[in-house]
Curated annotation (Swiss-Prot):
Keyword Nucleotide-binding: yes
Protein name according to UniProt: HPr kinase/phosphorylase
Sequence segments annotated as region (Important for the catalytic mechanism of dephosphorylation): 264-269
Keyword annotations of the record: ATP-binding, Carbohydrate metabolism, Kinase, Magnesium, Metal-binding, Multifunctional enzyme, Nucleotide-binding, Serine/threonine-protein kinase, Transferase
Gene (UniProt): hprK
Enzyme's top EC category: transferase
Subunit structure: Homohexamer.
Names of the cofactor(s): Mg(2+)
Cysteine disulfide links: none
Domain observations: The Walker A ATP-binding motif also binds Pi and PPi.
GO molecular function terms attached to this record: ATP binding; magnesium ion binding; phosphorelay sensor kinase activity; protein serine/threonine kinase activity; protein serine/threonine/tyrosine kinase activity
Binding residues for Mg(2+): 160, 202
Organism this protein belongs to: Bacillus pumilus (strain SAFR-032)
Length: 310
């Protein structure tokens, strides 16, 4: 699980540290935020203390109406030993009870000028991205006509050479050899290259080349959503390959099923063109145009008409 600490969100969103400085290295383990409205009323039975706490105008205006004794109790209960941070929006004034409780328990109190809903949305998106489940796959990720194509297959089958040809044809390289994948949403997989090999491509007999240096900034991308997987495998005599395009394979990556095509490799086949056409055909299918289904439907009509004539 990737690690995010309180100081990371401080730096990302330029938050002002008000108190509790000793806790800025506390880990944030969940992307959900908490707006402790019911807790301000004194109900802490289901208080999600492991979440970042966000205080807006509603929570603070209610807090100001509480008796002084209760105010101190509420803030002491709010600042636990595992609470990553308490953030105030709209540059609201920090209650002195909160400053005292945060210093005593080492809970960072931060302040932002953003509106509560805006801050909540940006924080959630940032944390979901950073805390998303991740994995790494041996393959090549290329952006082909806006479609994120993940090329997989045994070592030496020609993935990198195919990627180089695609780059020459105007498409963009995301990652070669090792693709780091994170699941940002239920059906959203985003791939990127490890920092060490970003923009690099290994070609056997040629060595390592820097795609951005050779072809320019327009030939690379830092990350791309994975839309389809293409498995390159050496052509096996006698093996049946899909010739109509009606059968749809799936490959499970983390918790997401991604459409998968198996493309046999043999001398004379232009893989780059095949992958381009596969990407365009995939886009057409998503727009409701399926050539294989249309052909099958027409064929069935012809067979039915011939049967009636007889």
């Amino acid at each position: 699980m990737p690690k995010v600490r309180t100081k990371d969100i401080m730096e990302q969103f330029h938050l002002e540290l008000v108190s509790g400085e000793e806790g800025i290295n506390r880990p944030i383990t969940i992307s959900d935020l908490s707006r402790p409205g019911i807790e301000m009323a004194g109900y802490f039975t289901y208080y999600p203390k492991e979440r970042v706490q966000l205080l807006g105008k509603t929570e603070l205006s209610f807090f100001e109406q509480l008796p002084e004794r209760e105010r101190k109790q509420r803030m002491m209960s709010l600042c636990t030993d595992i609470t990553p941070a308490i953030i105030l929006s709209r540059d609201r004034e920090v209650p002195k009870e909160l400053i005292e409780a945060s210093n005593e328990n080492g809970v960072p109190v931060l302040r932002s000028s953003l509106k509560t809903t805006r801050l909540s949305s940006r924080l959630t998106n940032f944390l979901e991205s950073k805390l998303a489940p991740t994995t790494a796959i041996h393959g090549v990720l290329v952006d082909v006509y806006g479609v994120g194509v993940l090329l997989i297959g045994k070592s030496g089958v020609g993935k990198s050479e195919t990627a180089l040809e695609l780059v020459k044809r105007g498409h963009r390289l995301v990652a070669d050899d090792c693709v780091e994948i994170r699941q940002e949403d239920q059906d959203t997989l985003v791939g990127s290259a490890p920092e060490l090999i970003e923009h690099l491509l290994e070609i056997r007999g040629l060595g390592i080349i820097n795609v951005m240096t050779l072809f320019g900034a327009g030939a690379v991308r830092s990350y791309k959503r994975i839309t389809i997987v293409m498995n390159l495998e050496l052509w096996e005599q006698g093996k049946q390959y899909d010739r109509l395009g009606l059968e749809e394979e799936k490959m499970r990556i983390i918790d997401t099923d991604v459409p998968k095509l198996t493309i046999p490799v043999r001398p004379g086949r232009n893989l780059a063109v095949i992958i381009e056409v596969a990407a365009m055909n995939f886009r057409l299918k998503r727009m409701g145009h399926n050539a294989a289904e249309q052909f099958t439907s027409k064929l069935a009509d012809v067979i039915e008409d011939n049967g009636q004539d007889e």
